C-alpha cells in the first residue's frame, strides 16, 4: 500500500466524491458517505482503502479482500464480496490512477525534498545566469554562465547545469544530474543521475582511434520524462532530439544524432546507437539494442531483450536476436524446439561422461 510517511495523502474522500472524480458509478448509494483514506492492492487493503480489479488472475485476492471499496467493470461486478462497496468503471485501472493522481500529487514529480523552495545558500550560480521567478536550486547545485531557467523549475541537489544550457518552465532536474550543450522544454522531468549532452562515441576506428569532435546539441521537447541514470549524447553535426511526450525508463543510453519521435516509450537498459531514428509512438521493451542508422517506423513495437539490426516498418511488432517480425520469430522458436525434441537432444548424458565427477 502507499507509504504515508513518504507520500502524505490529501484529506479523506467520500465514495460519492471518488465516484464523481473518477467518473465511476457507485452501485449502492448507501455507501455514499463511506470515507476512503488511501489506496492499496486487494490483498493489503483494509476498510478505509480503495482498490481495483480487472484481471482474473487476481480472483482469489478479490474474494478475500478487506477493501472498503473496489473499482471494477460491469463484467466482473458480481465477483466483488458483499461487504465491499462497488464503484463501476469502464476502465477500473484508469479510474484508480485518476484518484491516485489526486490523492498523491507529490508522487508525480522526482522531488528529493532536501531543500526549501528558493535558492539554497550552498548553491553556486554564475552572475550571468538568468532564473525566472519561483525557481528552486537545491544545496550544492551549480549553475554555469549564460544558463536560462524557467519559472517553477527545480534543480536538484548537486546537479550541474553547464554554460549556455536553456531549461524551460516547471521542470524537475534530479539530484546529481549533469546537463551541457542542451535545450530543455517545459515540464521535463529528469530523475537523479541523468547525464545529458556529453560527447558521443565518435572515433575514426583505426590505429590510435582518432576522436571526432562532437559539436551538436541535445534538444528535449516538452513533457518528456527521463529515468534515473539515463544518458543522452549530444550530436556530432546534427542534434540529438527527444520528441514531445516521450517517456524513457532508467539507465537508457541514447547515442549521438539519434532522433526520437513524440510519445515513445523506452523501457530500462535499452541502448540506441548513433544516428538512428524512432518515429512517433514507438515502444521498446527492456534491454533492446538497436544498430546505428536504423529507422523504426511510427507505432512499431520491439520485444524486450531484442537486437535490432534492420529498419522496422511502421506499426509492426518485432522481436528476437536478430529482430524479425514476431510471428516469424515465434514460428522459428517452435520449429527449433520441435527439432530438438525429435533429435533426442534432451536425453541424459552418457554414463561415462564423468568430467565433472567429484567437483565441489
Swiss-Prot record:
Gene3D superfamilies: Hexapeptide repeat proteins (2.160.10.10), MurE/MurF, N-terminal domain (3.40.1390.10). It catalyses: a UDP-3-O-[(3R)-3-hydroxyacyl]-alpha-D-glucosamine + a (3R)-hydroxyacyl-[ACP] = a UDP-2-N,3-O-bis[(3R)-3-hydroxyacyl]-alpha-D-glucosamine + holo-[ACP] + H(+). The active site is at residue 256. Residues 349-360 have a biased composition (Basic and acidic residues). InterPro entries: Hexapep, Hexapep_transf_CS, LpxD, Trimer_LpxA-like_sf, UDP_GlcNAc_AcTrfase_non-rep. Keywords: Acyltransferase, Lipid A biosynthesis, Lipid biosynthesis, Lipid metabolism, Repeat, Transferase. Its EC number is 2.3.1.191. It is an enzyme of class 2 (transferase). GO terms for molecular function: N-acyltransferase activity. GO terms for cellular component: membrane. PROSITE patterns: HEXAPEP_TRANSFERASES. Pathway: Bacterial outer membrane biogenesis; LPS lipid A biosynthesis. GO terms for biological process: lipid A biosynthetic process. Residues 341-360 are annotated as: Disordered. NCBIfam families: lipid_A_lpxD (TIGR01853), PRK00892.1 (NF002060). Catalyzes the N-acylation of UDP-3-O-acylglucosamine using 3-hydroxyacyl-ACP as the acyl donor. Is involved in the biosynthesis of lipid A, a phosphorylated glycolipid that anchors the lipopolysaccharide to the outer membrane of the cell. Homotrimer. Belongs to the transferase hexapeptide repeat family. LpxD subfamily. This is UDP-3-O-acylglucosamine N-acyltransferase.
